[in-house]
Amino acid sequence: MYIKQVIIQGFRSYRDQTIVDPFSSKHNVIVGRNGSGKSNFFYAIQFVLSDEFSHLRPEQRLALLHEGTGPRVISAFVEIIFDNSDNRLPIDKEEVSLRRVIGAKKDQYFLDKKMVTKNDVMNLLESAGFSRSNPYYIVKQGKINQMATAPDSQRLKLLREVAGTRVYDERKEESISLMKETEGKREKINELLKYIEERLHTLEEEKEELAQYQKWDKMRRALEYTIYNQELNETRAKLDELSAKRETSGEKSRQLRDAQQDARDKMEDIERQVRELKTKISAMKEEKEQLSAERQEQIKQRTKLELKAKDLQDELAGNSEQRKRLLKERQKLLEKIEEKQKELAETEPKFNSVKEKEERGIARLAQATQERTDLYAKQGRGSQFTSKEERDKWIKKELKSLDQAINDKKRQIAAIHKDLEDTEANKEKNLEQYNKLDQDLNEVKARVEELDRKYYEVKNKKDELQSERNYLWREENAEQQALAAKREDLEKKQQLLRAATGKAILNGIDSINKVLDHFRRKGINQHVQNGYHGIVMNNFECEPAFYTCVEVTAGNRLFYHIVDSDEVSTKILMEFNKMNLPGEVTFLPLNKLDVRDTAYPETNDAIPMISKLRYNPRFDKAFKHVFGKTLICRSMEVSTQLARAFTMDCITLEGDQVSHRGALTGGYYDTRKSRLELQKDVRKAEEELGELEAKLNENLRRNIERINNEIDQLMNQMQQIETQQRKFKASRDSILSEMKMLKEKRQQSEKTFMPKQRSLQSLEASLHAMESTRESLKAELGTDLLSQLSLEDQKRVDALNDEIRQLQQENRQLLNERIKLEGIITRVETYLNENLRKRLDQVEQELNELRETEGGTVLTATTSELEAINKRVKDTMARSEDLDNSIDKTEAGIKELQKSMERWKNMEKEHMDAINHDTKELEKMTNRQGMLLKKKEECMKKIRELGSLPQEAFEKYQTLSLKQLFRKLEQCNTELKKYSHVNKKALDQFVNFSEQKEKLIKRQEELDRGYKSIMELMNVLELRKYEAIQLTFKQVSKNFSEVFQKLVPGGKATLVMKKGDVEGSQSQDEGEGSGESERGSGSQSSVPSVDQFTGVGIRVSFTGKQGEMREMQQLSGGQKSLVALALIFAIQKCDPAPFYLFDEIDQALDAQHRKAVSDMIMELAVHAQFITTTFRPELLESADKFYGVKFRNKVSHIDVITAEMAKDFVEDDTTHG
């Protein structure tokens, strides 16, 4: 073992971490200037290994910290790494590190980076061969000089330390302390023995009276024992009887509680049924109200439809009569029109003939009148014009005017002809258009009738679907109410579960669900969602009989959360904390649970709890972790036996536990608050709620949605049909309007036709007159201008006058006749057009309208709708009647349930009264049992107070009755009163003091033996100390002589043990001969004392001659240092260490002696490591490795250097300063 490496940081001049290159296992030399830090390096090693730095005050610790430029060092450490390949240290490692760390307020040791105590370190070093009694494996600078100048007594002290006499001294001090303590105890015992002897003498005198007293007292105690024993047996019998009664009462109470719980369960079940039935009644009543409202609405619709149908039927019936009447009227109108037309046909030819004659007469009259006018004009022109030429000029002018007027007349006549022709053509065209529109009107009417029929069909279908939807709505409402009732029931069960569970746990479960919902909404951490499996309680099932024991076993572990891995739980917890959610959660990560298969006992009295649980094998680890080491046992006795035998937790079905550690827990467990039962109820309610919601969503809501879609489609169809109806009705109205307009046009054209014809006739007559005047003027042109008419012209005038008179008379007759006929025609035509034909048009229109109504579309649709509404009313009434029946039946059922509830309430009350009665009885029995137990304790106490009794006392009075016993007891008490003055405890005190005397005598003997042993031990210790000093002196003296001869060839040295005699004079013994002298002196005294030694002297000769032997004070300084070195080497050879540290031991030696010391170190380095410092080259010759210490900026540094650099360093230390 040797120092392999040293690491220093912050210690004295070593500020930065300094890792010294590994040392050689032989001789290592450190060189450096004065003050560079060599000695500090040695101090660092001594700081870790030596006792010198063991108890440091804060200011001393601060003094060891580095002080220099830069920030202050607040802590320092020194670490020594030992090569332990030889296993000298009792640690199974080739390298062992020992570090000491100090600061202003700390001082710690670390062994292989583990904190240890100072004592542990010192013990470890002592086990490796580092002796506390020989600290000279580290020789500091100046130590050689100190030893060279030390007095003899100091060397004796050194020899005693090397010999290890300190241990003997410590043990001697302990022995002296024990001896003093023993002496004190001996004195106390002597005093007690003296007092006891005096007391025993006094008690001896009181014994005689006490004997009589004891005789009667013995009898009294025997009697009292018998009395108390009889009372005790009687009390025990009563207690046994009470225990049996209590057990019976307890069993009965359990049965009553079970019956009461059954009654409560039945009552809860009945209450639930009543709630469900009331909810059902409420739903049915609500449905009935809805049905009533629907029925009222349906009745209103039916009434409207019935009135409408009646109106339509009446209208159809009326239309039929009206049609007959209209047809009859039409026929009469046609007959009258035909009659009038016939009359008109008969009158019109006459009228036309008269008119034609009249027109001819008028034309002839006009012509004759014009001709006469022309003749008169001709006669008048004779006086009018003066000449023929003037006349002709005027005639030409008149002719020109007449020609222009005639042309105008002709144009007018042509225009009227054209107008009449156009009127006739328009009439034909109008008739064609009218017929075409009439055909279109019939088509439109047919299309409207078809659309009406289709509209009513769609409407009826829509009404049927609405009725079906109303029914489904009622069903949905009923289901919703049932759903609400289920939700309320679920909330109550969840509330009960919450009440039976801690708030923090429930908050934790809610918070975990929020975290998972957050992951689902965000669509993240899918593996976390898949890796979470809920709480333990939701993942297994078992029989209800095991609920209590399972729940008691698991406790709050029922609410632990099962996850696939610790990663899943970490993710959940990170989000849990991030969202700052409340609650307490505990995870069971399946990948981290370490469960082993358990060997269960094979017995019929117990079964493994886990075998009664049903769960997914995937979660086997979690359930084995919670329930795997628990047995369900038949009874507490079995539980206790198995728990002790198999180191397993055991539990009964009632929940009484026996831990494998020995603890027993149990008592009454309220099964009504079973969390497993509550969880089962919650789960069942959730499933039922889910089924109702699924039914509601899958059936009713889907059907309602389907019907809504169909109704929407039908509404769209109805809107489309209505749009088409409006379109075709608008087209029909347009056609009718257009037909009316055409008819009016035709009538208007007929009205203007006759006036135009008369105007044409008038124009033609006027044209003839103008043409006649023109012919007359033309004939007069060129004739002679006469003042009188010619005879022929005069005759013509007379003839014309006669003709004119005749024509005027005829014309008047014709005019009268024409006016008469025209009046007839006008009256007939007016009657025809304004009355008959107009009425005929009205009749035709009414007949057309009747034909539209007579199609029966509206009536058919109304009748169909009325039948549908009647069916719905009937269905509604039937459903309402069914609801009434159901309500009656349900109310009857509620009454029956209420009666049953009353019965169960009475039964529960009876059970409760019985339980209360049993409880009171039990309390009475408990009180009585308490009193009996108290009496029992009193009897037992009194029996104990009687003290020890002879054997006869247990049997002597057993046959006596209590009366006899009390009589004898009274007699005893009377006799005992005579000895009331006697010291009752005299005998006891005598016996007690006698026993104490014996014990004290034994204790005195033991102390005497102990005192003698201590004296012997002290003599042995003194002898061993003497022998150790003698042996050590011999070894050191021998080694000193040998080492000195090697250091000083031819020289001689010896150690001298100096003694002091009784008279104060001194003697001395040298080296080897001292042993016999001491043994001789030992024969005169039983134990030789080391106190006779006063010092260790040194006698040396550097020439080897006996006569030149000198004392230390006679030597020079170098010789003293050499002798001191020889003494140190001698001590080290006597008690070798694994390594040595020498700081400038060759300082005062000359070159020759330094060489001898170097050779000595080389010899010793074969078996031990040396680390030395020097300023001389001789020590370098025996070294294996060299180190240089430099000091820069108040900081020391140590590095490996070569031998040449080391020599250069010691020869001229300024080179590497």
Swiss-Prot record:
Residues 179-350, 393-503, 669-916, 958-989 form a coiled coil. Residues 530-642 form the SMC hinge domain. The modification Phosphoserine is found at S787, S886, S1013, S1065, S1067, S1074, S1083. Pfam families: SMC_hinge (PF06470), SMC_N (PF02463). GO terms for molecular function: ATP binding; ATP hydrolysis activity; beta-tubulin binding; chromatin binding; cis-regulatory region sequence-specific DNA binding; double-stranded DNA binding; dynein complex binding; mediator complex binding. Belongs to the SMC family. SMC3 subfamily. This is Structural maintenance of chromosomes protein 3. It comes from Homo sapiens (Human). The gene is SMC3.
